[in-house]
Curated annotation (Swiss-Prot):
NCBIfam families according to UniProt: hemH (TIGR00109)
Gene Ontology terms, MF aspect: ferrochelatase activity; metal ion binding
Principal location listed in the UniProt entry: cytoplasm
GO terms classed as biological process: heme biosynthetic process
Protein name listed in UniProt: Ferrochelatase
Gene of this entry: hemH
Reported function: Catalyzes the ferrous insertion into protoporphyrin IX.
Pathway field: Porphyrin-containing compound metabolism; protoheme biosynthesis; protoheme from protoporphyrin-IX: step 1/1
Known catalytic reactions: heme b + 2 H(+) = protoporphyrin IX + Fe(2+)
Compartments it resides in: Cytoplasm
Pfam entry (one): Ferrochelatase
Similarity-based family: Belongs to the ferrochelatase family.
Disulfide partners: none
HAMAP family: Ferrochelatase
Amino acid sequence: MGRVGVLLLNLGGPDKLEDVGPFLFNLFSDPEIIRLPFRWLQKPLAWFIASRRTKTSQENYKQIGGGSPLRRITEAQGEALKEQLHDLGQEANIYVGMRYWHPYTEEAIALLTQDNLDNLVILPLYPQFSISTSGSSFRLLERLWQEDPKLQRLDYTVIPSWYKEPCYLQAMAELISQEVDQFPDPDQVHVFFSAHGVPKSYVEEAGDPYQQEIEECTALIMQTLNRPNPHTLAYQSRVGPVEWLQPYTEDALKELGAQGVKDLVVVPISFVSEHIETLQEIDIEYREIAEEAGIHNFRRVAAPNTHPVFIRALANLVIDALNKPSFKLSQAAQIKKMVKMYPPESWEWGMTSSAEVWNGRIAMLGFIALIIELVTGQGLLHMIGLLQ
């Protein structure tokens, strides 16, 4: 088989407080995160949002030590995966490629092209596929492949999603059991799955399979857990005025509190590493909401991190991928073929839902353009003298 490499893909996170602003700019510059019909708006809007959110985000990172542990944990996962593969008789070089911060995906690609690999497995550390996570990284990789003849000669395969992997499900079940068993009456503990949300339009208009995969994953974990506990699935991390997948985590916690739930375990189902969404959003913000709602016994399941059974799951995925027909980036992109900036709609005049959608989009663009012009002092209104 020759020299084998594994490229682990992840989001990335700021290592220190000074990195927060540039990290947010990179994040919001991605059209898979904020979807606009005009590409030229992307960078100015990203700058505007990042500049407005940096201070608040820095305060959140201060609460977890001043930076994200994501890089450290992901690199530790890579080292553990390398050892596990060695134990299974498969040698491999491991590379970490982050989408929005160091080590960037481009940096990982530069390293692996120097190593003269014969085979590469591209493994996103997102169990469930979404156009805003794995899809964004695949889009970037597809562009890098198109630009580099050396990459085009490399035999590689992609793992689009892997939430059904048995060892992954077993690891999640074990982690949940560890927390549930801390309660006096374990069978009555409410298991609360909190997934990272995405805008509802991603699913309903763009065809993102994320919600379906999250729901299936939740059911499979509960099946593997094989306990009678009631459970709920909700979605966290909503930003902006648009509607995201529901129920929202904060609303679901309040509702469970109103129903009399006292014992609750939160499962961060979208995340395989500790980072800001687990350590600050769940452990601090959602804990406070739950306690105010009357949920007095609040625990959170640890992310898989380097749990041995989880690392075995990653190793199984790599070995299976090496022994199956290759799955190419162009095939992964087929998932995104349905994804357009805005779906095709026929324009209908009058008080129709179609007209309202388009009116809303035009108003949104006008508002964004006005805000950017007011902040930057440059634009059409300044050119014609209406603003000074």
